[in-house]
Curated annotation (Swiss-Prot):
Belongs to the KdpA family. One of its GO terms (cellular component) is plasma membrane. Coiled coil: none annotated. GO terms for molecular function: P-type potassium transmembrane transporter activity; potassium ion binding. PANTHER family: POTASSIUM-TRANSPORTING ATPASE A CHAIN, POTASSIUM-TRANSPORTING ATPASE POTASSIUM-BINDING SUBUNIT. The gene is kdpA. InterPro entries: KdpA. It is found in: Cell inner membrane. Keywords: Cell inner membrane, Cell membrane, Ion transport, Membrane, Potassium, Potassium transport, Transmembrane, Transmembrane helix, Transport. This is Potassium-transporting ATPase potassium-binding subunit.
Length: 600
């Protein structure tokens, strides 16, 4: 690591802490039912929405009722996003006259945005109209994030409630999370981004003349905006000569704000946050990284306030930060190192006043290695998936760390709501292991952890590894899966592993060398995204319901403290052992082998 990397990481974490603490207090109020001081006008609008929807905000739900409402809402959202894409050509706000999106790509995209994954097999500026981007995709950026916040509110109530059968009202949690948190923060972040040069307009695309014509090859695109493939599934290339360049326009800033705050990650442009119209300056880059971590970090303090012990929130935040700092240091160091192949040729790759040094392939010069690697660590730790550099161009070890951050279960800060409830499931597992070692019935926050909670926690922990490993195995065995692998050997395997890791853990970033916009990958990855999201949420809600029905025991001399360094170490160890061990053989076949091949 360079001095610049260390300072950048330290400043980022310090600013994050300063912003997250007061937001966490505010989020605890949003998670309650009482009006918030100074926002009476918004409370009246909230009540108006309930009346319009015919919903009784005072009705509490059991965990099953909560889960059913959540699933119905998200299934309807999936159908809506799919329908908008399939009818795009006949809808307004389509100045480029884009055609309807293909059925398999529409299905993949609908599931992706509803599941808070935002995996994109398409290029946004060449496929989606302004209406599709704003109404369907940006709308789900809000709703999927609000769903995650609702689930963590329900789980926290499971710990704080005593001997009740309810865990809250899904419609209230969804509405309040959107009105009081996501919308106001998005307006603020969008204005800041516009001040840095992020565009916000409804203009048609601009054609500008090039100084010199350029001849190039690219995959041929059909009338539906999807690549044309031959009988073997390989893309058909066409040779083109360009005399002008088309510069895409659009309402970018409004989508960029919620894309980051909601840990969604789906870019308006194909280049995502590497595009200068999405992320033009070093300051906008810092703002976007802070936006990704802001709500996940704040929810740790929300957790502490709602359970009545701020030390619990600090302990969870400490475990997350420890894992994040260590893994970020590794990826920064890996990308700053000289490439052995170039070193053998005598190429100077050292950092100096004249050059960044290290591996600059796939990185924007306006960001450099430090800001690019920190962004990569942030976006994969937080299940966001936005990128300001191409992860496929990272070194083998540099690319492995983002993969590992996702494979930990997206609990290192994680997504909005999802990161904290994932880490709390690991905390339940940690106290269970500790209870076995000392021969006591395990407790967490005064609630006994018994067989039912452990069964549900086991489901939460095992669902995603099964989806990742099974999906990867199928893809590298079947011909349609192998047809999308453009890079042979270990790196090609890493691309497939990364794709299913990203999909099942609801991240959405990719090793872009994989041709994933095919019926095979669109369907397979959609399945991984759907079950990676909702097959985890339902057991979490079951845990919440079970805990809420239990009495809260008083602390005594035999109670294991869950707020000190010992518990943090136990929690980190549990995350590493359970999270990483599932994937060691797969990682050995991919990035580890590729790293060793550098020294041949």
């Amino acid at each position: 690591m360079t001095t610049q990397s260390i300072i950048l990481l330290a400043v980022f974490l310090l600013v994050l802490l300063v912003l997250a603490y007061p937001l966490g207090t505010y989020l605890a109020k949003v998670g309650g039912t009482a009006p918030i001081r100074g926002l009476g006008w918004l409370a009246r609008f909230e009540q108006f929405l309930y009346r319009m929807a015919g919903s009784n905000a005072q009705t509490e739900m059991s965990w099953k009722g909560y889960a059913i409402a959540l699933l119905v809402f998200n299934v309807l959202g999936t159908f809506f996003v799919y329908a908008v894409q399939r009818m795009q050509a006949w809808l307004p706000l389509n100045p480029q006259a884009f055609g309807n999106v293909s059925p398999d790509s529409s299905f993949n995209t609908a599931v992706s945005f509803v599941a808070n994954t935002n995996w994109q097999g398409y290029g946004g500026e060449s496929t989606m109209s302004y209406l599709t981007q704003m109404l369907a995709l940006s709308g789900q950026n809000f709703f999927s994030a609000a769903t995650g916040i609702a689930v963590i509110y329900a789980l926290i109530r499971g710990f704080s409630h005593r001997s009740v059968k309810s865990i809250g009202n899904f419609w209230v949690d969804l509405t309040r999370s959107t009105l009081y948190v996501l919308l106001p923060l998005s307006v603020i972040v969008a204005v800041v981004l516009m001040s840095q040069g992020v565009i916000q307009n409804f203009s048609s695309y601009k054609d500008v003349a090039l100084i010199d014509p350029i001849t190039y090859q690219q995959p041929k695109v059909g009338t539906d905006g999807q690549p044309v493939v031959d009988d073997k599934g390989a893309p058909v290339l066409e040779t083109l000569t360009a005399k002008t360049q088309t510069i895409a326009m659009g309402p970018v800033a409004s989508q960029e704000a919620i894309k980051m705050l909601g840990t969604n990650g789906g870019g308006f442009f194909n280049a995502n946050s590497a595009h200068p119209y999405e992320n033009p300056t070093a300051f906008s880059n810092l703002v976007e990284m802070l936006a990704i971590f802001l709500i996940p970090a704040a929810l740790c303090f929300t957790f502490g306030r709602m359970v009545g012990d701020m030390r619990q929130g600090w302990a969870i935040l400490g475990a997350m930060t420890l894992l994040f700092v260590v893994l970020t240091a590794v990826v920064m160091g890996a990308e700053q190192q000289a490439h052995p192949g170039l070193a053998a040729l005598g190429v100077d790759q050292g950092a100096s006043l004249m050059q960044a040094g290290g591996n600059m392939e796939g990185k924007e010069t306006r960001f450099g290695i430090s800001a690019s690697t920190l962004f990569a660590a942030v976006t994969t730790a937080a299940s966001c998936g936005a990128v300001n550099a191409m992860h496929d161009s990272f070194t083998p070890l540099g690319g492995m760390i983002p993969t590992v951050l996702m494979q930990l279960g997206e609990v290192v800060f994680g997504g909005v709501g999802t990161g904290l409830y994932g880490m709390l499931v690991f905390a339940i597992l940690a106290v269970f292991i500790a209870g076995l070692m000392i021969g006591r019935t395990p407790e967490y926050l005064g609630k006994k952890i018994q067989a039912y909670e452990m069964k549900m926690a086991s489901l939460v922990i095992l669902v995603t590894p099964c989806l990742v490993l099974l999906g990867t195995a199928i893809a590298v065995v079947l011909d349609p899966g192998k047809a999308g692998i453009l890079n042979p050997g270990a790196h090609g395997f890493s691309e497939v592993l990364y794709a299913f890791t990203s999909a099942a853990n609801n991240n959405g970033s990719a090793f872009a060398g994989l041709s994933a916009n095919t019926p095979f990958y669109n369907v397979m990855l959609a399945i991984a995204m759907w079950f990676g999201r909702f097959a985890v949420i339902v057991p979490v809600l079951a845990i919440a319901g079970s805990l809420a029905a239990k009495k809260r025991l008083e602390v005594n001399a035999g109670t294991m403290p869950t707020h000190g360094p010992l518990f943090i170490a136990l929690l980190v160890g549990t995350v590493l052992l359970v999270g990483v061990l599932n994937y060691v053989p797969a990682l050995a076949l991919g990035p580890v082998v590729e790293h060793l091949q550098l020294f041949k």
